[in-house]
UniProtKB/Swiss-Prot annotation:
The modification Phosphothreonine is found at residues 359, 528, 533. This is Putative proline-rich receptor-like protein kinase PERK11. The keyword Cell wall biogenesis/degradation does not apply. Belongs to the protein kinase superfamily. Ser/Thr protein kinase family. The modification Phosphoserine is found at residues 498, 527. The lineage of its organism: Eukaryota, Viridiplantae, Streptophyta, Embryophyta, Tracheophyta. ATP binds at residues 376-384, 398. The active site is at 494 (proton acceptor). GO terms for cellular component: plasma membrane. Residues 168-203, 211-244 have a biased composition (Low complexity). Residues 1-262 are extracellular.
Length: 718
């Protein structure tokens, strides 16, 4: 027991300058009391036991009440200490030596010595001494000469077991000597104040009991022995630290490279997505621009075909596109085998043709400089040339005569209408040309001239009755398509025999939409410019300019009268009062129906080579079409049904019996013609042929006016 006491005294003399501090002074090191070791001094009763030796578990030394408790070293966050446990005196936390020289005085005997310690300049107060004092700390382990050596390699020990220590036995003390100081001290790790990311955490310390215990890492090295292997262990620790540092740097570099590659990949993907969206946007915009014509309430295509008559092509409008025309969903060819025309460029958004745009040079080349020898007719607002395209297809080129605003509107109207209308009995538009002041429309060339040519041409064979019936039915179907199946309806406004073209099979095709107008309401349209041809004008249109679809019905009735009688609409070679076909035919039609004698109204050139029932049917149809009252006239659908079927013709009468319809008064008709002439006096379209081919004017305005005046005088005398 005495030997143990001596070792304790020696231990107290050795480390007392580093562990004694006032308990209340936590901010830093202050004056320390060092108790000199005497053989009679006992450790305090409340001091915890010293750590066990490597071989056997040690017990805390016996307690004594004579020694006062030492002060605790400074701590940034002082652990909670139970009030019943005063601080121990033997095993304080590791305290590396100050950079200053050793204490100025040493303890002698039992008298305490006060040694001032300067406060360390640490950012936060720590439980451990400044790192600069670690290398100067004297090694408390005794060597053979009992000389303290500095600790070269600070080591860290695992936390001691939580079980209470028992005092060391005499056998262990006698056999092994005094316990090593390294086993009694907590680990002293080098502290780097410049690395806040790696704070030094103390292991379990006997000063704080359970409250001061910090869980030790599983990778902590095992306690080194007191032999010379400490240096090797320290070098190994440094090597491991360097290896860990290199691994951390490599891992950070890999993470940085991965992050950089990820950012680059995301950027490239974003750019590709943006380019894809932009491409889709521009493609759709281009398609919309190329396939959609400007919205106009006046030029809209039909939604579908509803008339169940032979020769119609049934189209269906695409849903959701109010501007799409009937041709958008039409078959590749029409009923005549003509190719379906596609949409064009933005310059030709109103055109729907396969060859949408022609240059002026191209048209000049195929017409040899628009030579007069290529002229095949003169239309309502220009000449018509025949040309051969480069692929050998013949076309009819209609030139706009005037560059006025009215002529341009007519040109645009015809382009927009014809490009959207495709029917077996309607002329197809091939293309157009706009070059400075020149405007051209290119139509499919119909080779067999016009109905006017075959009916009234000189030195020509007589047109057979069967062909006349076929022509009447075909023209009626084409006109019915314009009225019934285009929305809004299209009013041709210049139906006449010279605007009905014939192909090689004598199938009729209605042409010349230069004077066409659209009627977008059920109400009549008042035109500011009366246009048409003498002999075909409806009375209400000639007198007031009121335009309806029944105006076209009246004009078509005049065409039927031409087919029946073979006479011209206005023939100045006829006797006075009989120059107008309508005035001459109406009383004779009524008489033929009542008496059953049609010999006076049928074309004598046929020489009775006709079907009488068909003649009667056409006579009744023509009589209903030329009624004075527009409301009493049938619609074109009824006309088609009357001509093309064997059904009863009662629907043509509209409640009017034969002979009860108001008959034209010759004087009244002449007055209406004079009003019409004054309204359109400046129009160059009147009295001209609007088809492809030339035909003679039926009457000059001078002759017609003088004859009408003479006829009115004789009529009043009667």
């Amino acid at each position: 027991m005495d030997k143990v006491q001596q070792q304790a005294d020696l231990f107290g003399k050795t480390i007392s300058p580093f562990v004694a501090s006032q308990p209340t002074n936590v901010g830093g090191f202050t004056d320390q009391k060092i108790i000199g070791g005497s053989e009679t001094t006992q450790p305090p009763a409340t001091s915890p036991p010293s750590p066990p030796s490597p071989d056997t578990q040690t017990s805390p030394p016996p307690a004594t009440a004579a020694q006062p408790p030492p002060n605790q070293p400074p701590n940034t966050t002082p652990p909670p200490t139970p009030p019943s446990s005063p601080p121990p005196s033997i095993t304080p936390p590791p305290s590396p030596p100050q950079p200053q020289p050793p204490p100025q005085s040493t303890p002698t005997g039992d008298s305490p010595v006060v040694i001032p310690f300067p406060k360390p300049q640490l950012p936060p107060p720590s439980l451990f001494p400044p790192p600069s004092l670690v290398n100067q700390l004297p090694d408390p382990r005794p060597n053979d000469n009992n000389i303290l050596e500095p600790i070269n390699n600070p080591i860290s020990l695992p936390s001691p077991p939580s079980t209470p220590f028992s005092p060391p036995s005499q056998e262990n003390s006698g056999s092994q000597g005094s316990p090593p100081l390294s086993s009694l001290l907590p680990p002293m790790l080098p502290l780097n104040p410049n690395s806040p990311g790696n704070p030094l955490q103390p292991l379990d310390s006997p000063l704080g009991g359970e409250s001061n215990r910090v869980p030790s890492s599983s990778s902590s090295p095992s306690p080194p022995s007191l032999s010379g292997s400490n240096n090797h262990s320290g070098g190994s620790n440094r090597h491991n630290a360097n290896s860990n540092g290199d691994g951390g740097t490599s891992q950070q570099s890999n993470e940085s490279n991965y992050t950089e590659k990820t950012v680059i990949g995301i950027g490239i993907a974003g750019v590709l997505v943006i380019l894809f969206i932009a491409g889709v946007f521009f493609v759709r915009r281009k398609q919309k621009k190329g396939s959609s014509s400007p919205r106009s309430n006046q030029y809209l295509p039909p939604a579908n075909v509803s008339v169940n008559t032979e020769g119609f092509i049934h189209y269906r409008q695409k849903p959701g596109n109010g501007n799409s025309s009937a041709q958008n969903s039409s078959p590749d060819t029409n009923s005549l085998g003509n190719p379906k025309h596609g949409r064009g460029t933005p310059d030709s958004a109103v055109i729907g043709t396969s060859k949408i745009h022609f240059t002026y040079e191209e048209l000049s080349q195929i017409t040899e400089g628009f030579c007069k020898s290529f002229v095949v007719g003169e239309g309502g607002f220009g000449c018509v040339y025949k040309g051969i395209l480069f692929e050998g297809k013949p076309v009819a080129i209609k030139q706009l005569k005037s560059v006025s605003a009215e002529g341009y509107r007519e040109f645009k109207a015809e382009v927009e209408i014809i490009s959207r209308v495709h029917h077996r009995h309607l002329v197809s538009l091939v293309g157009y040309c706009i070059s400075e002041q020149h405007r051209f429309l290119i139509y499919e060339f119909v080779p067999n001239n016009t109905l006017d040519y075959h009916l009234h041409g000189k030195n020509l064979p007589v047109l057979e009755w069967s062909r006349r019936v076929r022509i009447a039915i075909g023209a009626a179907k084409g006109l019915a398509y314009l009225h019934e199946d285009c929305h809004p309806k299209i009013i041709h406004r210049d139906i006449k025999s010279s605007n009905i073209l014939l192909d090689d099979e004598f199938e009729a095709q209605v042409a010349d939409f230069g004077l066409a107008r659209l009627n977008d309401t059920a109400q009549s349209h008042i035109s500011t410019r009366v246009m048409g041809t003498f002999g075909y004008l409806a009375p209400e249109y000639a007198s007031s300019g009121k335009l309806t679809d029944r105006s076209d019905v009246f004009s078509f009735g005049v065409v039927l009268l031409e087919l029946i009688t073979g006479r011209k609409p206005v023939d100045t070679s006829q006797p006075l009062g009989e120059e107008s076909l309508v005035e001459w035919a109406r009383p004779r039609l009524i008489e033929a129906i009542e008496k059953g004698d049609i010999s006076e109204v049928v074309d004598p050139r046929l020489e009775n080579d006709y079907v009488e029932s068909e003649v009667y049917k056409m006579i009744e149809t023509a009589a209903s079409c030329v009624r004075h009252s527009a409301l009493k006239r049938p619609r074109m659908v009824q006309v088609v049904r009357a001509l093309d079927t064997r059904d009863d013709l009662s629907d043509l009468t509209n409640g009017v019996k034969v002979g009860q319809s108001r008959v034209y008064d010759s004087g009244q008709y002449s007055n209406e013609i004079r009003i019409f002439r004054r309204a359109s006096e400046d129009s160059s379209d009147l009295g001209t042929n609007t088809g492809y081919y030339p035909s003679q004017d039926y009457a000059t305005s001078h002759e017609y006016e003088s004859e009408s005046r003479a006829f009115n005088t004789s009529h009043r005398n009667h």
